[in-house]
């Protein structure tokens, strides 16, 4: 992965701007996690993902009240797919913190020493092992026999892939030797060698099937097959490097555990070594980096771990990662080639993603023919804040470019050689309509900068086929319409059959149509599996049994849909999947407006009263903000500060300097203020934007959504199909009513979202940070800084079991 430093935090960020950016970052991270862990088809590089994570952490550090309010704050991986049975990890599978240069590694070592209270001359051993680029897997052995195999999932709940794991040659069904504890959870990475990956892709190509992008995707897709015979046909490998639940300790050091694993027949990486000196650790990193091309499998860095397990226990965890471990990522690998075409892919959230079709070139031992171009600005050579990138050089068809494999996942075009640009080349014209549905594609105004967002998005929303499956999954989810049993498989079947294109279609489903679609999908998948694995057609008796099971499942599904014909208004608003309209904003809207017709009428009025672009731009000037903006509009921009205070807009030196820097000179500032004054928002707009629980960012997203006729029509059709009820009210008599509750650490009996929903239903406010005003902290395994804050402020701390007992009592 590219060695990428975090960008400096914009200290002029207001609380509202921070909340909006935090929400966008959280959504982007969760979507990236889903694509990487569930779909095995990432759309951004590791480096881009790390930048998102670091920006999120920067904002949390600057605005502590936001910490934990976004699901991405403490998320690990992604929710397990509904195609597999679920396994709750006895010990959560967390992720690692990252380092991108030597200084960050040195700071990690120093941080560990500070935490332990050790001086620099006290010996402290670290292991250093290659970071395998594959799929994390947890193997649970009971009395030495493989009992369960589960993927990481979201860190707390994974997918049961036991039958598939049994086909992996490196994974012993029975541990060798003796001395293993009764319960022994072994964790490691499933991967494919370069040679086996090439052979699999050759077979895919010969069969006319899509090729895998890289070994990691191929390994993940192979392990997560519904048919174990397909997994068995692919030569997956496994390295063990960690553990989960142990009924008894097996060693005193990380090194000792790995040695014990090896005696039990579990493969461990031979390039793992132990060091007591930071310089030696970094030298080992350089050796591994130099040797990576010849290893025969993909790695994307080196992982350092404190060797002493007693010290690991003392160091503990913070947020989503251990204090005692760090991943030191590799720099990117690059090559030069030619852009043969630029195409647009529409992402599942409506983003228009430009992709460069390249003349095939080998980068780091892998043939690359596609590379991400990120967004419209990146193609034009313009950054998110209008600054030039690549010195302003745009990217065109026919250009000779430098391609980088950042993190060995998604190749990226980094630079352009203008000396080789064809004389007849033309700038790329980015589409202003969605290639998938023809709806307008827009770049929303970023309230922090006053400039358009980097990503152009389709406004088709509910009717765009590229977004359809993901939108519908959100619609039926637990926090949306909560239609029991309606998993992603059913949604995919309905979309493929053309039975569902918008939410209202769910309430028009017919038994026979649904059954025909399910049978057709199963027969197609069965034929594909038989062709790949060489197995025979199932007997008719088995087919009849399956048909009977289908009938029962379909009846249950239709009954579940019917049971949701009455829905609270806040759930309906959240289920629509409108950007920036999360659960809290949906509740605020349902609280302010009596019913959907009233809300829709208010939206129409607000759309006619929106502020103009000059008003938005003035608000976005650093350090100006709403209060100063309004004084400028009322009193104008003074040439100096000699006028009486009541007659001038009181400006700080920094505000005055920023205004002049933004607009050019005093006359330009005054002209801009005059134009902004003529474009003030009307009262109908401010009803939404000035509401502290809604705000201007969510307001603009709401108006944009309903401005698209397709979306408005889809909502109208849905309202014709269901009865909308007032928002669910909290239980006033509950002992939790009006209390502030914070959850920290891993919850074992329910997910974080479920716990939050329970607390809110009982009238509590769930916060992401601890203060003296917090009433209760529920702490699970891995609780970190929030637990310390609770102890500092004298806040009551309870376990998850205690919390559930309190809930049962009301």
Curated annotation (Swiss-Prot):
Belongs to the NAD-dependent DNA ligase family. LigA subfamily. Zn(2+) binds at residues 434, 437, 458, 464. NAD(+) binds at residues 46-50, 95-96, 129, 152, 189, 305, 329. NCBIfam families: dnlj, PRK07956.1. The gene is ligA. Its cofactor is Mg(2+); Mn(2+). GO terms for cellular component: cytosol. It comes from the Bacteria. One of its GO terms (biological process) is DNA repair. It is an enzyme of class 6 (ligase). Residues 731-810 form the BRCT domain. The active site is at residue 131. Residues 528-548 are annotated as: Disordered. It comes from Methylobacterium radiotolerans (strain ATCC 27329 / DSM 1819 / JCM 2831 / NBRC 15690 / NCIMB 10815 / 0-1). The keyword Zinc applies. One of its GO terms (molecular function) is metal ion binding. The keyword GTP-binding does not apply. This is DNA ligase. It catalyses: NAD(+) + (deoxyribonucleotide)n-3'-hydroxyl + 5'-phospho-(deoxyribonucleotide)m = (deoxyribonucleotide)n+m + AMP + beta-nicotinamide D-nucleotide. Keywords: DNA damage, DNA repair, DNA replication, Ligase, Magnesium, Manganese, Metal-binding, NAD, Zinc. Its EC number is 6.5.1.2.
């Amino acid at each position: 992965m590219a060695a990428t430093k975090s960008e400096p935090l914009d200290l002029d960020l207001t609380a509202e701007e921070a909340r909006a950016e935090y929400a966008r970052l959280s959504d982007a991270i969760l979507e990236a996690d889903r694509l990487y862990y569930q779909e095995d088809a990432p759309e951004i590089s590791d480096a881009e993902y790390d930048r998102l994570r670091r920006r999120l952490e920067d904002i949390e550090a600057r605005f502590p009240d936001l910490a934990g309010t976004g699901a991405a704050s403490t998320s690990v991986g992604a929710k397990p797919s509904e195609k597999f049975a679920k396994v709750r990890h006895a010990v959560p599978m967390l992720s690692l913190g990252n380092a991108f240069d030597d200084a960050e590694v040195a700071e990690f070592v120093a941080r560990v020493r500070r935490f332990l209270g050790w001086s620099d001359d006290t010996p402290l051993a670290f292991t250093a092992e290659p970071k395998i680029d594959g799929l994390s897997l947890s193997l649970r052995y009971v009395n030495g026999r493989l009992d369960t195999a589960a993927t990481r999932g979201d860190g707390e709940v994974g997918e049961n892939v036991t039958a598939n794991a049994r086909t992996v040659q490196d994974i012993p069904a029975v541990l060798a030797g003796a001395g293993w504890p009764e319960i022994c959870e072994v964790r490691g990475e499933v991967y494919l060698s370069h040679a086996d990956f090439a052979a699999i892709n050759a077979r895919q190509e010969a069969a006319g099937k899509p090729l895998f992008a890289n070994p990691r995707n191929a390994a993940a897709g192979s392990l997560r097959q519904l048919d174990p015979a397909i997994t068995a046909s692919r030569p997956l490998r496994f390295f063990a490097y960690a553990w989960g639940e142990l009924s008894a300790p097996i060693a005193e050091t990380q090194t000792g555990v790995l040695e014990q694993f090896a005696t039990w027949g579990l493969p461990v990486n031979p390039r793992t070594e132990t060091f007591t000196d930071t310089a030696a650790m970094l030298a080992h990193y350089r050796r591994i980096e130099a040797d990576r091309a010849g290893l025969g499998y993909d790695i994307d860095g080196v992982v350092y771990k404190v060797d002493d397990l007693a010290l690991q226990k003392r160091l503990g965890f913070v947020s989503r990662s251990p204090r005692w471990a760090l991943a030191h990522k590799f720099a990117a690998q690059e090559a030069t080639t030619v852009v043969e075409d630029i195409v647009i892919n529409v992402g599942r959230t409506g983003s228009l993603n430009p992709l460069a079709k390249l003349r095939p070139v080998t980068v780091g031992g892998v043939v690359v023919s596609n590379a991400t171009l990120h967004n419209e600005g990146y193609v034009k050579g313009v950054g998110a804040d209008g600054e030039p990138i690549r010195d302003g050089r745009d990217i065109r068809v026919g250009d000779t470019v430098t391609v980088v494999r950042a993190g060995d996942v998604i190749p990226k075009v980094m630079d352009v050689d203008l000396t080789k640009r064809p004389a007849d080349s033309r700038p790329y014209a980015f589409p202003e309509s969605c290639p998938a549905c023809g709806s307008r594609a827009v770049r929303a105004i970023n309230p922090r900068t006053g400039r358009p967002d980097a990503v152009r998005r389709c406004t088709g929303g509910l009717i765009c086929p590229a977004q359809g499956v993901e939108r519908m999954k959100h619609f039926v989810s637990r926090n949306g319409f909560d239609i029991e049993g309606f998993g992603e498989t059913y949604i995919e079947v309905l979309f493929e059959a053309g039975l569902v294109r918008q939410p209202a279609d769910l309430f028009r489903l017919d038994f026979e149509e649904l059954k025909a679609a399910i049978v057709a999908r199963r027969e197609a998948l069965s034929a594909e599996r038989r062709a790949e694995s060489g197995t025979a057609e199932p007997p008719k008796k088995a087919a009849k049994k399956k048909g009977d099971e289908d009938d029962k499942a379909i009846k249950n599904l239709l009954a579940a849909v019917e049971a949701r014909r009455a829905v609270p208004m806040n759930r309906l608003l959240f289920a629509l999947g409108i950007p920036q309209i999360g659960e809290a904003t949906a509740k605020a809207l349902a609280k302010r407006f009596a019913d959907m017709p009233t809300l829709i009428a208010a939206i129409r009025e607000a759309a006619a009263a929106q502020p103009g672009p000059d008003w938005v731009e003035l608000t976005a000037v650093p350090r100006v903000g709403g209060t100063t903006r309004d004084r400028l509009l009322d009193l104008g921009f003074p040439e100096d500060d000699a006028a009486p205070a009541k007659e001038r807009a009181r400006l700080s030196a920094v505000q005055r300097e920023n205004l002049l820097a933004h607009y050019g000179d005093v006359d330009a500032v005054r002209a801009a203020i005059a134009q902004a004054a003529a474009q003030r928002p009307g009262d109908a707009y401010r009803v939404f934007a000035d509401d502290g629980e809604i705000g201007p960012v969510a307001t603009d997203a709401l108006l944009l959504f309903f401005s698209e006729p397709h979306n408005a029509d889809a909502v109208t059709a849905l309202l014709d199909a269901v009865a909308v009820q007032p928002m669910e009210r909290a239980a006033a008599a509950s002992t939790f009513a009006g209390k502030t509750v914070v959850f920290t650490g891993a919850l074992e009996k329910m997910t974080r979202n479920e716990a939050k929903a329970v607390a809110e239903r009982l009238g509590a406010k769930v916060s992401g940070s601890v203060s003296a005003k917090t009433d209760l902290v529920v702490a699970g395994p891995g609780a970190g800084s929030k637990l310390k804050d609770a102890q500092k402020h004298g806040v009551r701390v309870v376990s998850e079991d205690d919390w559930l007992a309190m809930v049962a009592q009301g």
